[in-house]
């Protein structure tokens, strides 16, 4: 009897995060076998950030309070770090095993405008690490979650360069009122030499290297991000990398439409991932699959067993994207019942020599699009990352290493009301082949199809229509 009581107490003390959702329903009637991800298991210990010296007054820096609360929970084997309503200014947050960062309604975590608060410093020498430090991070951890109804604000405008062509006169004036530096041509504003915040490097180019992602999990297992709003990250909003068992459910991601590298959800070389019920309005790609470039991508491995359903993407460079770097490959991906409204492209497959890999078992079905400003479905194999100040390489396609191999992709039941072009594919021989697109309705404004002869795409029962001429 004593053993039974102890077992029951242990069961009550350690509980799996309840997602208030039957995730099993997303794993029925699949065209490819996908394992269902394992939810994180979090001990039922509770700590409030307020009990660790935290203040939600919008003035106090809470970096030490978050570190203290996480350390306290970690010593107990994990638990829930509760953040009540308030505005919590902070620097870097590092999560540990078996911890749930829970934001209650009207709780706002805001990352500091002072870039020094978001740069890792060597504890021995006091020197800055010469790389960007992700605002919320976990490395080689298991059973991690970020949940609740609150907001995480990346304060991205203090980090990102802005192109003059992408802002109004009023917005351009507002940026200049922050101080900063304007390029000699007057076409770029940099958050360098700001009025109220110090530089963290001697040049604009060096400071750009410190621009960070909002949330990054690396080599972790059993991750849940649910319910929260991710706002205005300096770079990508969330990027799990080489992780297994990842669920991203019901989050809102929002940043300015012109936010450089403002990707919403990027999955990099991960296995067993479920992405459902999210709403995205991003500055760059919406839901993007990555797999590393070159040898490092091959070593990291493919994105594998990815299930993407019931999401809505508003502005983004692409609603669903593969690339540009995926040398590790893409395998067993389902994209079903998603809506894209106002994205630059709907389904976007982009890569280039030295960045490409092989796709296998990619199934895309029942996608609904309206007001697509560019192509509804697009394949490109000469993509280059046009970041601020970049110059396109002259010999980008000369050496045939890590060549894109877009193949075994099956697209069906895509319904488009309004796009510039329907289906576009540009690539050299062997880069785009064994693609099927069938049973679709595409209402376009300029061109139904623009497919190179080298691209082997089978288009079946696709109804193209446009305005009467």
Region annotations inferred by a language model:
Residues 55-57, 294-298, 328-329, 355:
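Short, small-residue-enriched loops and turns at beta-alpha junctions
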Residues 87, 242-244, 252, 291-293, ...:
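Active-site-proximal loop/turn and secondary-structure-junction residues that shape catalytic pockets
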Residues 2-82, 87-100, 104-219, 224-226, ...:
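Extracellular "leader-to-stem" segments immediately downstream of a signal peptide or signal-anchor
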Residues 78, 92, 112-113, 155-159, ...:
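Short glycine/acidic-rich loop motifs that flank beta-strands on beta-rich extracellular proteins
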Residues 105-106, 142-150, 221-231, 244-256, ...:
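Right-handed parallel beta-helix
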Residues 93-102, 241, 328, 356-357:
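Short, surface-exposed basic-aromatic patches at helix termini and helix-loop junctions that form
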Residues 326, 337, 346-469:
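Extracellular beta-rich repeat passengers
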């Amino acid at each position: 009897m004593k053993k039974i009581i102890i077992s029951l107490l242990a069961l009550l003390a350690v509980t799996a995060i309840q997602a208030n959702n039957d995730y099993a329903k997303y794993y029925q009637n699949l065209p490819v076998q996908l394992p269902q991800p394992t939810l994180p298991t979090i001990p039922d210990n509770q700590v409030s950030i307020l009990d660790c010296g935290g203040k939600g007054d919008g003035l106090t820096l809470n970096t030490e309070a978050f570190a203290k609360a996480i350390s306290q929970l970690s010593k107990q084997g994990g638990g829930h770090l509760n953040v009540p309503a308030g505005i919590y200014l902070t620097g870097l947050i590092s999560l540990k095993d078996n911890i749930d960062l829970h934001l209650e309604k009207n709780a706002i975590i805001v990352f500091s405008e002072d870039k020094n608060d978001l740069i890792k410093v060597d504890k021995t020498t006091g020197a800055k690490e010469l790389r960007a430090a992700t605002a919320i991070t976990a490395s080689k951890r298991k059973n991690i979650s970020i949940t609740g109804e609150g907001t995480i604000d990346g304060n991205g405008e203090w980090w990102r360069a802005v192109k003059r062509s992408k802002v109004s006169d009023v917005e351009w004036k507002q940026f200049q009122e922050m101080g900063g530096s304007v390029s000699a041509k007057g076409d770029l504003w940099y958050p360098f030499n700001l009025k109220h915040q110090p530089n963290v490097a001697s040049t604009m180019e060096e400071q750009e290297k410190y621009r960070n992602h909002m949330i990054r999990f690396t080599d972790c297992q059993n991750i849940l991000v649910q319910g929260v709003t991710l706002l205005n990250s300096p770079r990508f909003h969330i990027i799990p990398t080489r992780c297994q068992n990842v669920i991203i459910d019901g989050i809102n991601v929002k940043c300015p439409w012109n936010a450089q590298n403002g990707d919403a959800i990027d999955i990099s070389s991960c296995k067993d991932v479920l992405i459902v019920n999210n709403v995205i309005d991003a500055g760059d790609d919406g839901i993007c699959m990555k797999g590393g470039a070159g040898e490092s991508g091959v070593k990291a491995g493919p994105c594998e067993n990815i299930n993407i359903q019931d999401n809505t993407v508003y502005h983004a460079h692409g609603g669903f994207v593969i690339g540009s770097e995926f040398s590790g490959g893409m395998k067993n991906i389902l994209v079903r019942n998603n809506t894209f409204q106002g994205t630059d492209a709907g389904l976007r497959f982009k890569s280039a020599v030295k960045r490409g890999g092989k796709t296998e078992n990619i199934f895309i079905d029942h996608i609904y699009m309206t007001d697509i400003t560019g192509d509804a479905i697009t394949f490109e194999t000469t993509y280059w990352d046009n970041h601020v100040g970049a110059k396109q390489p002259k010999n980008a396609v000369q050496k045939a290493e890590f060549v894109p191999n877009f193949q075994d992709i099956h697209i069906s039941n895509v319904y488009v009301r309004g796009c510039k072009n329907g289906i576009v594919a540009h690539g050299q021989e062997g880069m785009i082949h064994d693609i099927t697109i069938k049973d679709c309705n595409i209402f376009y404004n300029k061109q139904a199809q623009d497919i190179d002869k080298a691209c082997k795409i089978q288009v079946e029962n696709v109804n193209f229509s446009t305005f009467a001429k």
